């Protein structure tokens, strides 16, 4: 099977059950509706005749001039046997540069440590290009969720603070 990405882009949909506009939200309607088509903001890549979800277009993070899909890094981290679940966010350092921050909930019995951070960082680097490896790691007991059970990224972002130095960071 070929690993070459043939096409990538944003999904547009239309159909008989599509709403013609957002209720009392002309701004949202203008951003989303393209004639008869609805801009979903969901990015996909076609590979070997299948379409793979990459993430939301507005989730893309630019790190050192390179675009990173948080979902790709999350999938890689979630494959590590010590990780219960995780979220990857953009984090602004005090010098205004952006860095990837992995918020990790470890499985029961695994302790957060500098060695654990090094292990997870090396795991990501062994599967993804080095710039996709998070610089910052934060360990939490539980990842906050929305009412629908999705990761509450806004809650994670709100509690995030700029960090000067990333050496050995874990909390």
Regions found by a protein language model. Give the residues of each.
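AMP-binding/adenylate-forming catalytic domain of the ANL superfamily
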Residues: 126-150, 168-171
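Catalytic tyrosine of NAD(P)H-dependent dehydrogenase/reductases that use a Tyr as the general acid/base
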Residues: 22, 38, 149
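Short, small/polar residue-rich loop motifs at catalytic or cofactor-binding pockets
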Residues: 38-40, 138
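AMP-binding/adenylate-forming catalytic core of the ANL superfamily
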Residues: 15, 20-21, 28-31, 41-132, ...
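Acidic/polar alpha-helix N-cap and adjacent early helical turns
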Residues: 158-171
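Short, small-residue-biased leader/transition segments that mark boundaries at the very start
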Residues: 1-5
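Glycine-rich active-site loop/lid that clamps phosphate-bearing ligands
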Residues: 11
